[in-house]
């Protein structure tokens, strides 16, 4: 592999730059500090050279560029599998005989296809982000590893996973006010071509002098749902009966809201403006658009320190606002105090922190919890949050840790598998991207990902906004229905702002 690296003048308008580059198989990841809301980094995948799709036990790797085709040949040799119709098709069989939970992590799985992207490259990249894969793990990725039913996709059709390998990447550091443009070349024949692509990106970045200007279209402002309040409340009561029977302690029940969405990038602009979050993302595939502003880390792994982090969020209150919709700081402080001292919310949160600690225990030799029961605030809601940290055991990597963790207890329940079975029965359709994760893996072995919440899946100009609520024995059904709408509201408002 040949690493190509260019420096460029700082550009404070990543979305304006991405607008010029937006096409299928591109993405924009951004981050903002929780307290100050200041933007910290932006990562733009300007061109992908490979696309990886996982459906059940089959991973299909397709080249998107001639450079990607050269790498596909090397992957074919690495996996000892021939290329068929410009694609590498890898099949994985689940070993049902292994009983040890730790040993299960090392059984062959579709995750090995992602590992192969990095293991097959013998030359260490000059920059850890020159070789980078980014994408989406669906909620149903778990089904390969656990004995769970396979549901049909009705709204959100994201595959078990879909990842891209970057050919051209732009990293903007808003703190350091620096820009790096990276290229991954897998054959000497394409070095000149990719070097020119980086120069073109550099010139394009220099030309961006102002921020993104959102667009508006004639579209309906109406919102519908796949489940009415009354039906959702019945499902809450059904889960509470299972809790009384001792089947589960908690489950996260969700429903979907639907809107017309013709201007996805503009809706993302409004979302990140009103709801700056640690994880903001816009992914454009050939089949769909996925964007969001997630407050919750799925798994963050630093290969240099060998530490993994999980950031459980559970416990929600509306922000304190006046009649005009502005923050009333006295009322907001009262809402924060009420959240921190609510027995039901605290008990639910501590239970999910314990679940996160147990997930971390499978792969870590040392672990601890800090920032216990802290409050993070966003545009419409505030949350109780904690942070669980662990040092991974020898032989474990980021994907072993992710396998141990998925799916987040804050999006499934406790006990996790029992809760998911009940969720599948009640929701009766694939969640797709919702409750899964969006993130990246780089060549040094690090991973950063967020839980796919506060997100919108758009296909054929139809937006699907899914939101859930944690159900425990003390839950008030109407309150839980209201909570799902409150969590979806930031997305609904963002899309409405793109309507004429």
Swiss-Prot record:
Membrane-spanning parts: none
Pfam family, one: Chorismate_bind
Catalytic EC class: lyase
GO molecular function, one term: anthranilate synthase activity
Keywords, sorted A to Z: Amino-acid biosynthesis, Aromatic amino acid biosynthesis, Lyase, Magnesium, Metal-binding, Tryptophan biosynthesis
Chain sites annotated for binding Mg(2+): 348, 483
CC cofactor note: Binds 1 Mg(2+) ion per subunit.
Residue positions binding chorismate: 315-316, 434, 454, 468-470
Catalytic activity: chorismate + L-glutamine = anthranilate + pyruvate + L-glutamate + H(+)
Assembly information from the UniProt record: Heterotetramer consisting of two non-identical subunits: a beta subunit (TrpG) and a large alpha subunit (TrpE).
Listed name of the protein: Anthranilate synthase component 1
Biological source species: Helicobacter pylori (strain ATCC 700392 / 26695) (Campylobacter pylori)
Organism lineage: Bacteria, Pseudomonadati, Campylobacterota, Epsilonproteobacteria, Campylobacterales
């Amino acid at each position: 592999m040949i690493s190509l690296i260019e420096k460029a003048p700082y550009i404070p308008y990543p979305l304006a730059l991405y607008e010029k580059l937006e096409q299928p198989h591109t993405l924009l990841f951004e981050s903002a500090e929780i307290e100050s809301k200041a933007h910290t980094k932006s990562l733009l995948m300007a061109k992908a050279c490979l696309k990886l799709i996982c459906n059940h036990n089959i991973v299909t790797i397709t080249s998107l560029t001639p450079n990607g085709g050269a790498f596909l040949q090397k992957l074919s040799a690495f996996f000892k599998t021939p290329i068929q119709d410009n694609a590498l098709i890898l099949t994985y069989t689940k070993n049902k005989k292994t009983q040890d939970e730790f040993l299960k992590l090392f059984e062959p799985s579709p995750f090995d296809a992602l590992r192969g992207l990095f293991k097959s490259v013998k030359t260490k990249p000059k920059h850890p982000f020159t070789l980078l894969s980014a994408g989406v793990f669906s909620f149903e990725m778990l089904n390969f590893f656990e004995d769970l039913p396979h549901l049909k996709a009705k709204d959100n059709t994201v595959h078990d996973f879909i990842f891209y390998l970057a050919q051209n990447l732009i990293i903007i550091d808003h703190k350091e006010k620096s820009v790096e443009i990276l290229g991954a070349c897998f054959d000497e024949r394409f070095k000149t071509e990719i070097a020119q692509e980086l120069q073109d990106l550099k010139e394009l970045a220099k030309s961006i002098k102002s921020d993104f200007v959102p667009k508006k279209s004639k579209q309906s402002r109406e919102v519908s749902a796949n489940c009415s309040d009354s039906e959702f409340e019945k499902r809450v009561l059904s889960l509470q009966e299972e809790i009384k029977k001792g089947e589960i302690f908690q489950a996260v029940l969700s429903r979907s809201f639907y809107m017309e969405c013709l201007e996805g990038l503009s809706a993302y602009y409004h979302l990140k403006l009103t709801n700056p979050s640690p994880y903001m993302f816009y992914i454009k595939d050939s089949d769909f658009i996925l964007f969001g502003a997630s407050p919750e880390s799925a798994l963050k792994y630093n290969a240099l320190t060998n530490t993994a982090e999980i950031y459980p969020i559970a416990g929600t209150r509306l922000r304190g606002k006046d009649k005009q919709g502005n923050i009333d700081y006295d009322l907001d402080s009262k809402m924060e105090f009420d959240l921190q001292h609510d027995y039901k919310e605290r008990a639910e949160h501590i239970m999910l922190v314990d679940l996160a600690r147990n997930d971390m225990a499978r792969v870590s030799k040392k672990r601890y919890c800090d920032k216990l029961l802290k409050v993070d605030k966003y545009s419409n809601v505030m949350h109780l949050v904690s942070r669980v940290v662990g040092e991974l055991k020898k032989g474990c990597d980021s994907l072993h840790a992710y396998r141990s963790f998925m799916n987040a207890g804050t999006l499934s329940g406790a006990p996790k598998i029992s809760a998911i079975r009940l969720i599948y029965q009640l929701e009766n359709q694939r969640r797709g991207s919702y409750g899964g994760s969006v993130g990246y893996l780089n060549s040094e072995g690090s991973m950063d990902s967020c839980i796919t919440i506060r997100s919108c899946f758009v296909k054929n100009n139809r937006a699907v906004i899914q939101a859930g609520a944690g159900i425990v024995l003390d839950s008030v059904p109407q309150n839980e229905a209201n909570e799902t709408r409150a969590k979806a509201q930031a997305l609904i408002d963002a899309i409405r702002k793109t309507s004429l």
